[in-house]
Amino acid sequence: MIEIRFHGMGGQGAVMGALILAEAAFSEGKYAQKIPMYGGARRGGDVTVFLRLDDKPIRRTSGIYEPDAVIVMDPTLKKQPFVRAGLKEGGTAILNDEAEPKEVDLGVELGRVATIDATGLSTEVFGQRAIPIVNTPMLGAISKATSWIKLESLSEPIKHQLPGRLGELNIKACQRGYEAVRVTEG
């Protein structure tokens, strides 16, 4: 089982991103479970989403406190202790950050670090927004940086959740994220 914890701010699409990733996993014959957690302040407040992926049914229904991977959707969150809390040694971190992966220090020995300027990509694809839509560029980055989900498996769930022109723009953002991510092993 792969246990993933998303960290973002309300409005960035962490919950939707985890849902799309879960649907893509399901389309590949895997099992998926998504559990969002957020406070009363939605837009702009901290959002955490727990996502499990497995080849067999998932029975565990708790939060994820020792993740195999963290997905950090807002660059301001990378220094927060709750982001690295419980992250397994040798785990994966995928961050919305302009820094090179080798410059990232979460205080735990990681097996894989990936960075992408998802905020910049969001601005290029969607235009300037008060809260940039970074979930789909991050999904592209996740696809390339890991073997969890194939890039082509993300298109249909994106179209399903975000129909029409918005879906097409998000597919473009996802593909751009796949192309732009930088990955460092060990």
Spans of features found by a protein language model:
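Active-site cofactor/cluster-binding pocket
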Residues: 1-186
